């Protein structure tokens, strides 16, 4: 299938927290055979994308050991952190499948982090931004002068 996304975000300039005000995702998965299943697939991919964009950080020690080996250390969004996206469809049946269906559900795993990163970078006036966009990382962009003393002492 095919997909496009757009969103509006707010970045708290004190805490560095990101709030997704509105998220719209449009899918062309050919003929929609089961609307509930399609919505579930899109919503699940969207939740994974929120995690990749804002929460899930692969932390390693200086000797290369993985530090986030449990869910106590590796943050994933819960249903309270995942906003409800607006899901739109356009149906252009595939000529290559018997019922005209195409793939659906995987797209938001890839498009959501990019969409959110572009929105946050635009909100902060940045050319690029690394994922995940944790409050600490965003605070370093918002208040770089305040981060410099901590970096000098090895605290960031």
Model-derived features: positions:
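C-terminal catalytic domains of large/alpha subunits in multi-subunit enzymes
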Residues: 1-156
